[in-house]
Amino acid sequence: MLWKLLRLFIIIKLIQLAIIYFSPCQFDTSSELIIQNLSSTSSSKSYYNVIITTILNKLIVWDSVYFNDLFINPIQFEHQFVFCPGWIQLIKLLNIKNYYTAQLTSILISNLCHFASVITLYYLTNEMDMKFGLVSGLLMIISPAGVFLTGNYSENLSNLLTLLMFLTYYKSINFNDVKQPSNKSITNILGYIISGIFCAINFTVRANGLLLGVIYVFDLYHFIQNKSSSQIILSIITGSILFMTFLMTNIYHYIKFCPGREWCNNTFPSLFQFAQHHYWNVGFLKYWTPNNIPNFILVLPVLIFNIYSLGYMYQELPKNRKLLPLIVINGLIVVGGTFFWNIQILNRITSFSPLIYWTLAYNLKKPWAKYAIGYCIVWNFVQTGLFAAFLPPA
């Protein structure tokens, strides 16, 4: 099993790196400024050969411009706070002084997280009483997130933490406890609390991880049905780990910037919400403009497949009640991405969702599934070329 996954993983990554290396030029050359700035001293020059250095330079596009800057320099300005600190601080902990070494290290760690996510999905699939763990893992390797899972974006670490949360959660819950009115009970207290810790850490890596907390709201509702005070308290404690992380993050932002900024006087003074709205044009239907039609077209296959997966897995609920929290979480991400956020990010931020891989695995023998897999493979490489040229989608 491990060798089959690793073999495809290496093949896909090598092809992507080859495309990046041989891509002729970049549409936007602004990333050269950060390269010149961060590698200006002799101690920050590249120690690596021309192939590795060229690939590293071409991977500094879109959000990677910010990540590579923040791996070396502190977060100072409001707009930088949309990049949650967890992934950045992990690289900073390594205390790497050379810019190129920091970038290469972050890429290697990111890819290790990608492969660890694939392995975790394999075990999660088995935990959900499904028989296609290997197929699901292979499908995650060719995820439409593509080259974003090869560069040093935060998606891979977030995906790994999300899947570890799901795995520890499902190992800690009995969904067939006939003694309880909700048929649901906690069987492993430590595992359940650990799932909450993974959830909270994930929020420090990607802010949309806050939506994962809905899983503990479901639990609270079910345990109230059970009239089990101990399990009610456990669900509140575990969910509160995420809530306290969210609260402390906002308190830190307030102490750092307030009262001098306009958002400090809001009813709920959130720097992240302000920065997303003010600097990144995030808000209800704000992205629904004619100039963004190409981004809607680029994300349409992923959007359609996510919606189809939600419907397909909803039909599976009578046979597998465990799916409900995953359906709700995936649905919230799709709604947020479609109506509130920059829609093209759905290409990468839905890569955590087991539902899309399970739906494809369920229907593997159907003709449309072969077309879907073909699309994933082709899109991986087309997107890599676009990424290397600093072209959308971001």
From Swiss-Prot:
GO terms for molecular function: alpha-1,6-mannosyltransferase activity; glycolipid mannosyltransferase activity; mannosyltransferase activity. The chain crosses the membrane at residues 2-22, 47-67, 104-124, 132-152, 185-205, 232-252, 293-313, 323-343, 371-391. GO terms for cellular component: endoplasmic reticulum membrane; glycosylphosphatidylinositol-mannosyltransferase II complex; mannosyltransferase complex. GO terms for biological process: GPI anchor biosynthetic process. Keywords: Endoplasmic reticulum, Glycosyltransferase, GPI-anchor biosynthesis, Membrane, Transferase, Transmembrane, Transmembrane helix. It is found in: Endoplasmic reticulum membrane. Its EC number is 2.4.1.-. It is a multi-pass membrane protein. The keyword Glycoprotein does not apply. Pfam families: Mannosyl_trans2. Pathway: Glycolipid biosynthesis; glycosylphosphatidylinositol-anchor biosynthesis. Its main location: endoplasmic reticulum. It comes from the Eukaryota. Mannosyltransferase involved in glycosylphosphatidylinositol-anchor biosynthesis. Transfers the second mannose to the glycosylphosphatidylinositol during GPI precursor assembly. Belongs to the PIGV family. This is GPI mannosyltransferase 2.
